[in-house]
Amino acid sequence: VKLFSGTPLSQFSDRPAEPQAPEAAGGAKPEGRKTAASKGAPKAGAPVARALPAIPEAPATTPVRVVPLARLAAGGRWRIEAMRSISEPLLLWFTRGQGRITVGGVTRGYGAHNAVFIPAGTMYGYEAGPQSYGNAVFFGRGCTLDLPAVPLHLRVREVGPQAELSGLIDNIQRELESGRPGAERAARHHLGLLGVWLERNGETALDGKKPDAARRLAARYTELLEGEFRSGKGVSDYARALGVTPTHLTRVCNQTCGRSASDLLHDRVIFEARMMLSETRLPIARIAEALGFTSAAYFTRAFQHRAGKTPSAFRRAG
């Protein structure tokens, strides 16, 4: 089961890794990311850079999947805890355990019988304890169902709705695993009923309250960050685009999720780096360039500061 549903990393170039820049030691803070000024034309007489492997476009559609929550963390807890988004709607149904989940820059606690719906492209990450159980429903890239346009966090306290939601998810999974003719189509019909369940129960989300100004700004920041984290922009650039000061943006992020604006940015970039290192054979220099770093050495220092090991050591560890 493929758990990562951004650009299909397995389709990246599978050329042998090219020679990479020497890796720097130490834990310096992330630096050396490209800015608009650093992306200009090369100086006259500069050597022409050798072309690096290209990253292809993602497919337009992906299948519906139901995945146990425990399996999402296979390969490392960073796969669920780091900030990221996926290009398809997602429902997390927690049936046991508790922890914290951050969606759109806002952190809340979750417990048993909590349903969290995350629209495509929405940044999220969550902590899961050893006793956390449930399922993740991936609606598929290209999903045309009428689904909520904003995230929902539903605390399902009544037994009836709990059983209804669990039954819908079981029906989807049963069809997908049956191998019978029309199973995919039947699963999508059950998925449509799941969308209706979200619509009916979503009316009570957050007690009908609209998000305050801080939460709206945090959501706008994470939405902007998700679209531009590869650009090399810093917090000051995002703050300018949002019409606020970097200090105010950082204060708001600390208020809504307990993390600074810079921490959210770096977490998102390094998550993508981890995925590219673990799921592709792209050279480290190509990954650094794709994520907006000015050199492989700067990328190595930033990665080691967050991940505790160099990019090549992380890749070797699998």
Language model regions located:
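…primarily DNA-binding HTH/wHTH and HhH modules…
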Residues: 1, 26-33, 37-38, 42, ...
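Membrane-cytosol interface segments
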Residues: 2-58
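Basic, amphipathic alpha-helical hairpins
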Residues: 174-181, 197-205, 221-234, 252-253, ...
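A short, Lys/Arg-enriched amphipathic alpha-helix from helix-turn-helix/homeodomain DNA-binding modules
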Residues: 209-242, 247, 264-282
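Terminal helix-turn-helix DNA-binding modules in bacterial transcription factors
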Residues: 255-295, 316-318
